[in-house]
Amino acid sequence: MIHLPQGSFTQGLIVGQLLTLAIIYVFLRFFLFCSPIPKSVANSPKQTGNETPDETPSTPLSNNKKRYKKPLTILEPHILNLLYDVNEHEPESLDWFNVLIAQALIQFRYDACSNDVALRKLETVLNKGAQDKSMVDHIYVRDLSLGDGFPVFSHCRVLPHQHNSSQLRAEMLVSLTDNINCTVDTKLLLNFPKPAFATLPLSITVRICKFVGKIMIYFSPSNGAGQPAYMNLSFDPNFVISLQVSSLVGARSKLQDIPKITQLIESRIRQWFTNRCVSPQFQQIAIPNLWPTSAKEGHARSHAPQEESSNED
């Protein structure tokens, strides 16, 4: 027969209750009712013994500068290797891109033909760009056809930029076989012995039948001072463009397809394209800023009360 010491059960019960109360107290004291760590302390980097804390007072602007790191405007070489290996990546066919361009071009032609908006725009450009108004009368665009073919992009490659090895450029071949034609009517002015002494009717039709070339696309990053980023497009100097120019001069006795007029029109078209689109020249497309600036936000807020008051009236 085993004899238990008296009071063992009572002592165990008391000790167990005390331990339970102690655990509950620790949990409530250090997990529920403790004061949170300040965000400035939590977000600040750990300082070593050799570093001295900054004694300048913090402002919201300075906090933003510490919180947001300045994004990269160019890709680092190791990032480029992860995204695209310029040395081993095979050229792409761009079949999917051709389908998207074809759909966009269909809509563009439809919009251009609506109410002859493209015809009027071209007429304005031709009259504005006429160099010698004393020899040529007002230019009228009689007919304009944007064709029914589609450009084919192929053999796309991504290469380092020629002037900046840390940036990339995309090169692709483009070919277009179509019948894009424009017919203009004007008058040649004879200014002797007096201004506009006689006029000579002139009708010119220009057809673009084929174009083959290499297009280069690269980006110009923003400088952060209000200047947007740009997408630049340029063509290689070794391009091929096939033109057909027909001319008709005179009212009654008409002269057709004068070689000198054909050569002059072809050289002017090639010169216009070279001076604007052929490397080192390029065309730029501004990339819109998706993040509104404080000035734009303030402008929107200033107009909001006026709109509400007008609606109430």
Swiss-Prot record:
Cytoplasmic side: 34-313
Keyword RNA-binding: no
Keywords in alphabetical order: Endoplasmic reticulum, Lipid transport, Lipid-binding, Membrane, Transmembrane, Transmembrane helix, Transport
Biological processes, Gene Ontology terms: aminophospholipid transport; intermembrane phospholipid transfer; mitochondrial genome maintenance; mitochondrial membrane organization; mitochondrion-endoplasmic reticulum membrane tethering; protein insertion into mitochondrial outer membrane
Residue intervals of the SMP-LTD domain: 90-288
Entry superkingdom: Eukaryota
GO molecular function: lipid binding
Membrane disposition: Single-pass type I membrane protein
InterPro entries: Mmm1, MMM1_dom, SMP_LBD
Compartments where located: Endoplasmic reticulum membrane
Chief place where the protein resides: endoplasmic reticulum
Transmembrane segments: 13-33
Cellular compartments per GO CC: cytoplasm; endoplasmic reticulum; endoplasmic reticulum membrane; ERMES complex
Segments on the Lumenal face: 1-12
Compositionally biased tracts (Polar residues): 42-63
Region (Disordered): 42-65
HAMAP family on file: Mmm1
Function: Component of the ERMES/MDM complex, which serves as a molecular tether to connect the endoplasmic reticulum (ER) and mitochondria. Components of this complex are involved in the control of mitochondrial shape and protein biogenesis, and function in nonvesicular lipid trafficking between the ER and mitochondria. The mdm12-mmm1 subcomplex functions in the major beta-barrel assembly pathway that is responsible for biogenesis of all outer membrane beta-barrel proteins, and acts in a late step after the SAM complex.
Subunit structure: Homodimer. Component of the ER-mitochondria encounter structure (ERMES) or MDM complex, composed of mmm1, mdm10, mdm12 and mdm34. A mmm1 homodimer associates with one molecule of mdm12 on each side in a pairwise head-to-tail manner, and the SMP-LTD domains of mmm1 and mdm12 generate a continuous hydrophobic tunnel for phospholipid trafficking.
Recorded family membership: Belongs to the MMM1 family.
Swiss-Prot/TrEMBL domain comment: The SMP-LTD domain is a barrel-like domain that can bind various types of glycerophospholipids in its interior and mediate their transfer between two adjacent bilayers.
Listed name of the protein: Maintenance of mitochondrial morphology protein 1
Source organism of the structure: Schizosaccharomyces pombe (strain 972 / ATCC 24843)
Lineage, uppermost ranks: Eukaryota, Fungi, Dikarya, Ascomycota, Taphrinomycotina
Gene: mmm1
